[in-house]
Amino acid sequence: MTQVVRTDSSNSDFRNLVTLLDQDLRIRDGDEHTFYAAYNKIDSIAHVVVAYRDVTPVGCGAIKKYSDLVIEIKRMYVLPEYRGKGIAGAVLSNLEAWAVELGFTESILETGKKQPEAIRLYQKSGYITIPNYGQYQGVENSVCMQKKLTK
């Protein structure tokens, strides 16, 4: 059974999962990894979830305020051996529910063209592709997405 726990970026399980995420992205992004890494710092993220299978941390994600009503989904990751089991969807839906509780009405995110499984997850969860925002404007390998959040 999967349990999703709310925490913050000081959580050691979250930090360990993010280390694995960064290793994966370093391979996928190649030379562009340094650009993306600059926007993926976790020190000040107050809203983090970690998914556990029994006592094993298997996935994570975070939300970060983008504007008064908009949150940004950050640091989504599931261990490879646990993918395809609904964990990423559970993490995402928990983050969205938390965002609604905090008063946000919209969610945005950036993922990479080299992450087709992430793009499929977000599309399946109701996200639509939007023009690249903020620091991702003009970045060829970025895919930005958005979803209206409802209670």
Go through the PLM ranges and name each one.
Residues 2-74, 79-80, 92-93, 132-135, ...:
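Acetyl-CoA-dependent GNAT
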Residues 7-10, 105-108, 112-125, 131-151:
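C-terminal "cap" of GNAT-fold acetyltransferases
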Residues 17, 21-24, 98, 121, ...:
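Alpha-helical interaction/dimerization surfaces of two-component signaling modules
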Residues 55, 59, 86-88, 126:
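Conserved phosphate-binding and hydrolysis motifs of nucleotide-dependent enzymes
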Residues 69, 85, 101-105:
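Short coil/turn segments at alpha/beta junctions that flank glycine-rich nucleotide-binding fingerprints
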Residues 78, 84-97, 124:
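Conserved acetyl-CoA-binding loop-helix of GNAT-fold acetyltransferases
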Residues 92, 99-110:
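Conserved GNAT acetyl-CoA-binding A-motif
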